[in-house]
């Protein structure tokens, strides 16, 4: 408290993952010791559309949190703005994409800003910050509070675990560290100061250091199945013993109960571990730098760690090689195995076997060579499957299918299509008798050029018992009628315009189109067009009955095909 009775004002920046950043900003704002002007920034995360966050916790219940300030990027901090007193950093380093020390440069004020790095799940990151900012105090922070983000603006916190803080390296700024602990405890966060956090960091990384590199070296991301091998399990236990010896040199030891609980959680985690995922995506494996740091610590303590050195050398030599499909990807069990398989062809394809790139000693052919008998088939369209062969349009069913629409053609099932093919498969000489015996077969030749008339037998049939159903489909009721007579001039062909019938009177005999038309309708390539006029009449009389047998349009009474 100041002399005027007012609280001290402290400017704090929290940058990192949304969950831990929101937790820190929320509790610092509620501190009863100082007036905290906190600024939060979500690093490498989607920008929320609102400035109010919903926070649920077991200790404090459901609360609304509105940060004092927000930044979308660190470059928004101007040089004339008030410097930050504390900067909480919860960012994992990524040497391939960015340097952590360079990112923090706009918000760090030399000899003033205190850097607090959240080293939960990491080790040795503070050394790079010490080299970049030698004049600023740097502290390490570890917390095991379970945090989760349910949506962009909704967070959940479990039991509030204590915060462990310690000076990084040779920093002895105990006064600023004690002041920071008071601010955190004013926000009801229990905090504790330790001499070093290295034993806790090694304990958190013991299982990842002893398991993740083995999944990369064996090309098997399935941890439970990997530990079933006796040699791999012995190697895993040997690495844990070396890490325990390193903790003993630092004045601590690994907690066996905590390790067993972590092992159960890790082995039940069905997703691929981050080290194997980074290796598969051709990115630097993060666990390698942690291995190097543990080896350096062992060297300073004059401790022999042969297994750690061997694993570190092997994984460092293969992480920059070209990627090879793993041998045991099918052994990995994960949530993706239970997801629906959209493309069965692609799902069933096995990954490329590395041995397929080497010529097979049992086969004289190259793996990618094509035999001579298969070269003529290269580039051809594969034949239709057995189910689609029955639906293909052939010369037998082209006459009827050419009169149908695409929708009705799609609704023709194979039994109906087979029935149609059987009806139309006979010679076109008896086509009229197949559907309706009332009409005569092909009759007399035309009387006049370009004019079609019916034989007396056909006229007699047309006068007898014309059903209203046939007249509904356009069957003429009067052969002498001027508008619908089969023997008159206005007799129109299927799918043609009847208004242009007179214009075709003199062109029917000589045009190539009519010859092609007669050939298609009558399947009678040897018959002249003039001699096939009666066949056209016979075909015309078949169309209404065919349509009656296979209805094409929707109606009140629709026959089920």
Curated annotation (Swiss-Prot):
It comes from Schizosaccharomyces pombe (strain 972 / ATCC 24843) (Fission yeast). Keywords: Phosphoprotein. Residues 465-503 have a biased composition (Polar residues). Residues 369-390, 429-515 are annotated as: Disordered. This is Uncharacterized protein C24B11.07c. Pfam families: ApbA (PF02558), ApbA_C (PF08546). InterPro entries: 6-PGluconate_DH-like_C_sf (IPR008927), 6PGD_dom2 (IPR013328), KPA_reductase (IPR013752), KPR-Related (IPR051402), KPR_N (IPR013332). The modification Phosphoserine is found at residue 383. Transmembrane segments: none annotated. The lineage of its organism: Eukaryota, Fungi, Dikarya, Ascomycota, Taphrinomycotina. One of its GO terms (cellular component) is cell division site.
